[in-house]
Amino acid sequence: MAGKARVHELAKELGVTSKELLATLKEQGEFVKSASSTVEAPVARRLRESFPSAKSADSAARPAAKPGAPAPSTPATSAKPGGPRPGPKPAAPAPAAPAAAAPAATPAAQAPAPAAPAASTATPAAPASNAPKPGRPTPAAPAPAAPAAPAAPAAASTPAAPSTGAKPGGPRPGPKPPRVGNNPYSSAPAERPAPRPAPGAPRPGAPRPAPGQGGPRPAPGQGGPRPAPGQGGPRPAPGQGGPRPAPGQGGPRPSPGSMPPRPNPGAMPARSARPAPGGRPGRPGGAPGGRPGGGGGGYRGGGAPGAGAGAPGGGAPAGGFRGRPGGGGRPGQRGAAAGAFGRPGGAPRRGRKSKRQKRQEYDSMQAPAVGGVRLPRGNGETIRLARGASLSDFAEKIDANPAALVQALFNLGEMVTATQSVNDETLELLGGEMNYVVQVVSPEDEDRELLDSFDLTYGEDEGGEEDLESRPPVVTVMGHVDHGKTRLLDTIRKANVREGEAGGITQHIGAYQVLTELDGNERLVTFIDTPGHEAFTAMRARGAKATDLAILVVAADDGVMPQTVEAINHAQAADVPIVVAVNKIDKEGANPDKIRQQLTEYGLVAEEYGGDTMFVDISAKQGTNIDALLEAVLLTADAALDLRANPDMDAQGVAIEAHLDRGRGPVATVLIQRGTLRVGDSIVAGDAYGRVRRMVDEHGDDVLEAMPSRPVQVVGFTSVPGAGDNLLVVDEDRIARQIADRRNARKRNALAAKSRKRISLEDLDSALKETSQLNLILKGDNSGTVEALEEALHGIEIDDEVQLRVIDRGVGGVTETNVNLAAASNAIIIGFNVRAEGKATELANREGVDIRYYSVIYQAIDEVEKALKGMLKPIYEEVELGKAEIRAMFRSSKVGNIAGCLVTSGTIRRNAKARLLRDNTVVAETVTISSLKREKEDAVEVREGYECGLTLTYSDIKVGDVIEAYELREKPRD
């Protein structure tokens, strides 16, 4: 075949389909694209050797030569037609070692492969005990040549194994001509196959074999039993196996174009069923022209795979063990060339996968399978996820498919989408199923990591001790509602703030700075006023965190109240010193000593009782002992606190409260904790950012810079920051915007995870039923009030039949956008200390949106609670109307059975519910009185002592039965 062979041409030549041939090529490590692709000559040769149909003409034994055919050119024994088969000629006396040493098996690494055929055939097969072990070379020590001579009579006595005798001293016969179509060196006619070439002839289409690769590998078990060591005949010294032909003696190597075409396997002569004479020595009945050491007729050599025979009866070694260079291959064939067009060595087996395929399949295996979904398997690694993370975030951390996590959660009873925020418990449950430890990062840690990504820190003073300067103390006034906190601040500031508060209660945090004297020195003190109402728990906690010292105001006539205890807990949790101000000592019934005793239970022991807490009896209304209270505050601050900060660094602080001003936009009351805030600084507070355009103090005066412990109102935010958010100065607006955006996204995810109602598969039926839901939109004058109102509304205890959902919240007046959202979602708008803007009222009237305005927080809570209870399904209770006894029975073809009754108690009404009793046993539970007559006249009701006739929706009635009528009335909820 000229040039490279194509796959489909090889398939046609080998008698197989192209698909099978492509599969074989893939098993051998040769990857071709299609049947039209070409393959290299060594690959094509391996393919021809791999298919039995192609090897039947190459390696199978042939029958004897046909009558009339020309004899081979070599002086071999030929079979005469019609005559008896000649017996073996007795070997002539072989005088020298060359004749006896030629048939001896030589090691694969030393003996030349093309042994002399005449000398090989002259030596008959050795006895079974002397046969060499396959794959094992004989000892290298040369043995005397005598054992080879007496072996001739033994072989001659076997008529079934004729052999050609060697003539001593005569010329060696030349190599036999190769078969047509297999050897390109052949010049014989193509119409008749020629015998197999002798070992000395070069292999067609392949380089000259190296020493030790002369013959094909015999099949296992066909070479006879193995001889004991040392019985396989003498091992010749190097160079005694006959001269090696010179490179020019084999004829010129033809080009691929001059090679004759390979005959079709179907046109080759069939194998003979019986052994032909002239077979290989070592097994009777070999094919003519067989190689020394071969098996019987039609079989391969008797050596083990990958090893050569070692004694008479075994062929030359053909390569090493499998898997080694020069070894492997199919049994009886030469070893594969190491690294040539595929894997070196190694026998290609059909149906086996390569190591690469096995490795790829192993790497793609994933476990465990949760609910039929394959998930990655962890080794107890810790996965850090933000609060409110989605399954997509989780999948990105563990390199998994989000859809698989969704399916796994569905099988675990949770229905979520890939981008939906998931609560902490669900994430931990899913992580445990995959052997991961899910660690939900706290908001503080997440914010710290966010600032670290921008090389920012919060909460630490820069520089050393020499950079720190003293600052005023920050004092928070805490206590129960109506105990006089704001009046105390008014007395200290000599102002009147309380009258401006709705309902006389504080609903904001106010920050003020007061100048006072201590030992003749003027000292500044910053005061923060916190609400005392129960709804403002978060604001009190925020005030405790932003302060240095707390004044606990307790009314002497009221005692310790729930919000007093809560304020103590907030201050102790923030590790803040407490000074107790016992207020209202001027009122009747005031008992300051009782207050001291009650507070002892909470760890506040007065100094006069041996403790370390300072108690001051004051009257905020009369202004009694106010100076003593300020002195106690300053003394406690100087003794217990290190009030120093670095004023030269970028400002850091906390937003105490924030609101939306109609003319100025978002305004935040900020307490500077360290550094100095200046006009023009780029700032970020929570999810709000901006640039400081203006700063105003508590008196309304403009301030250019704010030092530590200075409360100011900051104008310039793009949105209203949350109360309690940390304020930070950054280098440029771009960084502030990026920090705010990421905080906003985190806040949204956490809020979505918190508000998502968990619905399991068991509750799916009931969840899909119509449920009552009250949607609210909250608008307030500042963010702290809106936050407190939302927390209070969510704290209303109500049945699961009704859900409360806050769909939007904000600071400022009610806008048209709020009205449109309320109209689309059937929501109610609650405005706290705000009113509708522009045409929002007209739009609300046109759309039918209800807007409620409140100025006191508990009024809003009470009305929302009533609305929620009104949305509940009514509760009915059963009320007995009366009883009637059946005295007679009448039958009618139109209405059925008619009962003549006497009303024994109460009243019997038409269409009322009833139950039928027989011998004080309920026969029918839900029966309706369908008709009622009195003296042949229809009646609506019949009272006690009167007779009546009635029909029931139950026909099995008897005389003596009792009819008990009742009705269901709605029961008011508590």
UniProtKB/Swiss-Prot annotation:
It is found in: Cytoplasm. Residues 479-486 are annotated as: G1. Residues 619-621 are annotated as: G5. GTP binds at residues 479-486, 529-533, 583-586. Residues 470-641 form the tr-type G domain. Residues 504-508 are annotated as: G2. Keywords: Cytoplasm, GTP-binding, Initiation factor, Nucleotide-binding, Protein biosynthesis. Residues 279-332 have a biased composition (Gly residues). Residues 31-376 are annotated as: Disordered. It comes from the Bacteria. Residues 52-68, 97-133, 148-166, 179-191, 267-277 have a biased composition (Low complexity). Its main location: cytoplasm. GO terms for molecular function: GTP binding; GTPase activity; translation initiation factor activity. Residues 583-586 are annotated as: G4. One of the essential components for the initiation of protein synthesis. Protects formylmethionyl-tRNA from spontaneous hydrolysis and promotes its binding to the 30S ribosomal subunits. Also involved in the hydrolysis of GTP during the formation of the 70S ribosomal complex. NCBIfam families: IF-2, small_GTP. Belongs to the TRAFAC class translation factor GTPase superfamily. Classic translation factor GTPase family. IF-2 subfamily. This is Translation initiation factor IF-2. It comes from Rhodococcus opacus (strain B4). The gene is infB.
